[in-house]
Design a protein with these regions (language model features):
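Acidic, proline/glycine-enriched N-terminal capping motif
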Residues: 1-139
Length: 139
C-alpha cells in the first residue's frame, strides 16, 4: 500500500532540541505544532484506524517553496521551470526528520525507511508532498 500526503504551506524542518537550565531537553513549540499538524492531516485522510506499514519502506519528499515577492519576472520563470532552486533553510536533512511525526501512525518506526529522496523547488503554491511505499512496489 502507498501513502501520499500533501501538507499545505511553506515547508518546515524539524528544529534542534532545546535545553533548560537544568539540562532537560525539549522539542521547540514550532516543531511540535507542525508535527501535530502532519499527524492530523494523515488521520483526516487515512483514518485513525489505519494499520501502520510493515517492512522496509521508500520515502520521497517534495518541498515546494513560495517564490519570493522580490524575484524578477525572469527569475520567477527560472524558479517555476526548475532552473533555480531554493538553497535556503530548512535543510533537507531537517525536513526528512519530520518523518518522526508519523511514527506509530503510518509506520511502526522511521527506522523502516531504507530509501529517502528529498527535493526542494519553487512553486506558485507552497506545500510539501510525502510519498511512502514498501520497497519494490511500483511508484
Amino acid at each position: 500500500m502507498k501513502i501520499s500526503l500533501v501538507i499545505p504551506g511553506n515547508p518546515v524542518g524539524k528544529g534542534r532540541p532545546r535545553f533548560t537550565r537544568r539540562g532537560h531537553a525539549f522539542t521547540p513549540k514550532k516543531t511540535r505544532t507542525h508535527e501535530a499538524f502532519i499527524k492530523a492531516l494523515f488521520i483526516q485522510k487515512y483514518g485513525a484506524d489505519f494499520t501502520p506499514l510493515e517492512g522496509p519502506l521508500e520515502m520521497e519528499i517534495l518541498c515546494c517553496f513560495a517564490i519570493p515577492a522580490s524575484a524578477s519576472k525572469k527569475r520567477r520563470q527560472d524558479m517555476l521551470w526548475q532552473r533555480e532552486f531554493p538553497t535556503k533553510r530548512p535543510d533537507v536533512d531537517n525536513i526528512a526528520k519530520l518523518s518522526d511525526a508519523l511514527n506509530g501512525i503510518a509506520w511502526r518506526d522511521d527506522a523502516q525507511i531504507v530509501s529517502l529522496a528529498v527535493m526542494k523547488q519553487y512553486s506558485k503554491k507552497p506545500h510539501m508532498e510525502i510519498k511512502v511505499r514498501p520497497v519494490g512496489e511500483e511508484p
